[in-house]
Amino acid sequence: MIEINKIYNEDCLDTLKRIPDNSIDLVITSPPYNMNLRIRNGKYCSRQIVKEFSTKYEGFNDNLPIEEYYEFHLKVLKELLRTSYIIFYNIQIVTGSKRAIFKIIGELSDYLKDIIIWDKGYAQPAMAQKVFNRRSELILIFDAKNAISRQFEKANFNRGTLDDIWQIKRGKKVTNSHSAVFPEELVKTIIENFSNEGDLIYDPFMGTGTTAVVAKKLNRNFLGSELTQQYFEVIKSRLEDETYKLFNKKNI
């Protein structure tokens, strides 16, 4: 078994190779959105202007060709389905992701349990004319064992208390180079309602570490992968700070 309560500074596919089957209780993640791919004259091309506003990755411009982006997600999701029970996969439908994401939904339809609409309450004005402002994102829920049923085997909410549209404000920036930070409230809602204390939570695209920080606060074990060294250092700092807070709280 891979060492838990640890973040690995590597590609998530390398981490997943070392994770045994059915050993992750819950996955919460938000992969890159392929923000820097656009359409010009009916063809996909790299979009330079957005790079000033989008998340910065080491050695990765977030502009994969659609087929490569699709293959990447498919490979990751198949590994997550092998290792995990329930997967919450947050993605925004943008030009560079749209075709790939809907193709993935079709390819993995046997494992798609439900979809949550995350309403962030505010949308940046669109950068082009005649385009919707994007206020919402999708959270695709995959179930490796019993996706055909709408019931969740491990659920801590009562009948009629949880909707499929979640109104949660976007997360606050932890570092200037990462624009798409998970809000703690979103992660907390998922962890509290779909896992128990002591469960193992995995985030293959850890970003600035919100999944690990919230898991620690809620007495869950965590595991994460993050390829970008800068974000890896941010995660370490946040987890050290959270350990200090928890230690002091226990000794008051």
Whereabouts are the PLM-identified features?
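Core catalytic lobe of class I
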Residues: I2-V234
